[in-house]
From Swiss-Prot:
Residues 13-61 form the F-box domain. Keywords: Kelch repeat, Repeat. The keyword Repeat applies. This is Putative F-box/kelch-repeat protein At3g10510. SUPFAM superfamilies: F-box domain, Kelch motif. Disulfide bonds: none annotated. Pfam families: F-box, Kelch_FKB95. It comes from Arabidopsis thaliana. Kelch repeats lie at residues 123-165, 178-229, 257-305. InterPro entries: F-box-like_dom_sf (IPR036047), F-box/kelch-repeat_ARATH (IPR050354), F-box_dom (IPR001810), Kelch-typ_b-propeller (IPR015915). CDD domains: F-box_AtAFR-like.
Length: 371
């Protein structure tokens, strides 16, 4: 242990002597976000800088933004739902050290189940759902009307105005700076509207929308869960077209969710354990070939796109039980690159496939936030 005299003689760290402007403009924006926690250990100066909104503005101007994957894991044994972040595969977390890939965000509080989770910029809005895990009391108690906002830059939360009515089993969509949420109150379906500019609620509907079970069981691109590259809400029109196709809609109970990448819709078919595609220009369905390395038996799935890569989360149930908390479940994550070959077929390559967690797990949500 250093004496007081020795402490005074100890020269300051080279890093802490660097001006803030140099750190903010030249160093920190280029450091991958998964290394920010290590960077913040250097000094209090760095801790304040990596949490600064200015850093993320600079990252955007320099083209150094990243697509960060957030996964909500519901633990049926502990009866808690918590957010995790998925780190990119690096040399430090190659096979054998996958626990470094899925990181619990300890600063965020437990989350509700069956809620609406909506990405807007660097924020995640959490609306409605259930905080009580006692299913037997759900018929007697209405869903929560609490709404909060998660700032993904600092991993902090703040409350926003309560919903006019508590909803659960929600789907949602951001249109014209408003969040439209369709959910159930008891057995009936209701649509509510949240204005992002004023952060106030109002009863409202969108032309052509109907508050019925079709929307509650529709694909999540309609709900705004998956990143979309379609312009002018074409993804919404695409989903309407698909939902009107009676031949295809009969299969939707087998699809958990989907995402759009490169104007192609990708959805995991948990009945046949294959990754399906939908081409809106050709109006045809297809199958991604070359994915034999995926673990079989994905009983639940979530798929998102990060850059030019698909991230597929699979829950594999090894031992079945009516109560999920007594099931032996594994959470797998596969990173898949895809390419369209000359004959028009889409082929995929499994870049990595890791077992992340085990236990009585359910994937509550999976979102991509650009930071």
């Amino acid at each position: 242990m250093l004496s007081e005299d020795e402490k005074e003689k100890t020269p300051p760290s080279v890093m802490t002597s660097i001006p803030d402007d140099v750190i903010m403009e030249c160093i920190a924006p280029r450091v991958p976000r998964y290394n920010h926690s290590m960077l913040s250990l250097v000094s209090k100066q760095f801790r304040s800088l990596v949490a600064s909104p200015r850093l993320y503005k600079t990252r955007s101007l320099l083209g150094c933004t990243e697509d960060c994957v957030y996964v909500l894991i519901e633990d049926c044994i502990l009866e808690v739902a918590r957010w995790y972040s998925l780190n990119r595969r690096t040399k430090r977390n190659m096979p054998g050290t996958v626990e470094n890939r899925l990181v619990l965000i300890s600063s965020l509080p437990p989350m509700p189940t069956a809620a609406s989770y909506v990405v807007v910029g660097s924020n995640i809005f959490v609306m409605g759902g259930r905080y009580d895990w006692n299913v037997e009391e759900w018929e007697a108690q209405p869903p929560s009307s609490i709404a909060l906002c998660i700032d993904c830059r600092t991993h902090t939360t703040r409350l926003v105005a309560d919903m006019p009515v508590g909803l659960m089993t929600n789907v949602s969509k951001v249109i014209d700076e408003k969040i439209y949420i369709v959910g159930r109150v008891w057995a009936s379906a209701t649509i509510v509207e949240f204005d992002l500019r004023t952060e106030k609620w109002a009863d409202g509907t969108k032309p052509g929308w109907e508050a019925d079970d079709r929307w509650l069981t529709s694909l999540s691109t309609t709900a705004g869960r998956g990143p979309s590259s379609f312009e002018n809400n074409c993804d919404h029109k695409l989903m309407e077209d698909i939902l009107m196709d009676k031949e295809e809609i009969k299969h939707y109970h087998l699809f958990d969710n989907e995402c759009v990448m490169g104007n192609i819709l990708y959805v995991y078919d948990r009945h046949k354990y294959i990754l399906r595609t939908y081409d809106p220009k050709q109006r045809t369905w297809g199958v991604v070939k070359g994915l034999e390395k995926l673990p079989l038996g994905g009983d639940e799935s979530y798929i998102v796109s990060r850059g030019k890569m698909l991230i597929l989360f699979l829950i594999v149930v090894l031992e079945y039980d009516d109560d999920a908390s007594f099931q032996k479940r594994e959470l797998w994550c596969a990173e898949i690159t895809v390419e369209r070959r000359e004959e028009g077929e889409i082929w995929g390559k499994v870049e990595c496939c890791d077992l992340l967690l085990e236990g009585g797990l359910i994937i509550g949500s999976c979102l991509v936030v650009t930071l």
